[in-house]
């Protein structure tokens, strides 16, 4: 399954952009939940895709912060 944005594209983002992208995806997830509750959602597969993207971005964010705090 090919996502609209891949992990390679996420790795190019800096920490501020990652945070903005996470916020945007969480808003999208909220909107999907609202549509599902009102029975307007036909594309339930988007839950899995967005959750996976959020998890990937959170992992990248933690890795970047760990690499910045670790002395070489």
Swiss-Prot record:
The keyword Ribonucleoprotein applies. It holds the Pfam family Ribosomal_L29. GO terms for cellular component: cytosolic large ribosomal subunit. GO terms for biological process: translation. GO terms for molecular function: structural constituent of ribosome. It comes from the Bacteria. Keywords: Ribonucleoprotein, Ribosomal protein. Gene3D superfamilies: 1.10.287.310. Belongs to the universal ribosomal protein uL29 family. NCBIfam families: L29. This is Large ribosomal subunit protein uL29. It comes from Prochlorococcus marinus (strain AS9601). The lineage of its organism: Bacteria, Bacillati, Cyanobacteriota, Cyanophyceae, Synechococcales. The gene is rpmC.
């Amino acid at each position: 399954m090919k996502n609209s944005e891949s992990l390679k594209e996420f790795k190019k983002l800096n920490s501020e952009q990652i945070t903005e992208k996470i916020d945007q995806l969480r808003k999208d997830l909220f909107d999907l939940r609202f549509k599902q509750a009102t029975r307007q959602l036909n594309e339930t597969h988007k839950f899995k895709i967005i959750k996976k993207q959020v998890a990937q971005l959170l992992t990248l964010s933690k890795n970047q912060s760990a690499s910045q705090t670790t002395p070489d």
